[in-house]
Amino acid sequence: MMTSCNDCKKLNENVIQDEEKVYDPEKMLVRLSVIEVYPEYLDEYLAAAATVGGESVKKEPGVICIYPSHLKSDKNQIRILEIYRDQEAYQSHIASEHFQTYKQGTLHMVKNLELVDMTPLDPSAMPYIFKK
């Protein structure tokens, strides 16, 4: 586990390392899930999203971040920032029991879902933000 930001070292422009992990920004999967939830299921959905996010980060070494939030102006509009070490970590995540429980349990709650793949502007800053 990384103990401080001082443990992070930028090895070169493409690889970031802390004492135990190496992340290749070219392989990382960064995604924004854009979700609209039916109002009558909002509380139930928010609880499920918070649970699966926390479990995933704790249990899966390749899950760097799952950070659900909602728009201030419309709580039914959910955004989830997802960051995975690589495609393999993402595939492992979506096959996990806790993700499948979340997915199957919330399908009827979701009015609309869009998955937007992103490219980080400064991947070298990630070790300073996410200390996993």
Predicted segments with their positions:
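Short, well-ordered beta-strand segments in beta-rich or mixed alpha/beta enzyme
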Residues: 28-36, 65-94, 132
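C-terminal motif of bacterial Sec signal peptides marking the signal peptidase cleavage site
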Residues: 2-4
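Short, well-ordered alpha-helical segments
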Residues: 46-47, 100
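Glycine-rich beta-strand-turn "strand-cap" elements at beta-sheet edges
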Residues: 6-30, 69-74, 103-132
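Short, surface-exposed ligand-recognition loops at beta-strand->loop->(often short) alpha-helix junctions
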Residues: 36-45
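Short amphipathic alpha-helical/adjacent loop interface patches that line ligand
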Residues: 49, 53
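Short alpha-helical
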Residues: 40, 73-75, 85, 97, ...
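An amphipathic, aromatic/His-enriched active-site/gating alpha helix that lines ligand/cofactor pockets
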Residues: 7-12, 55-64, 83-118
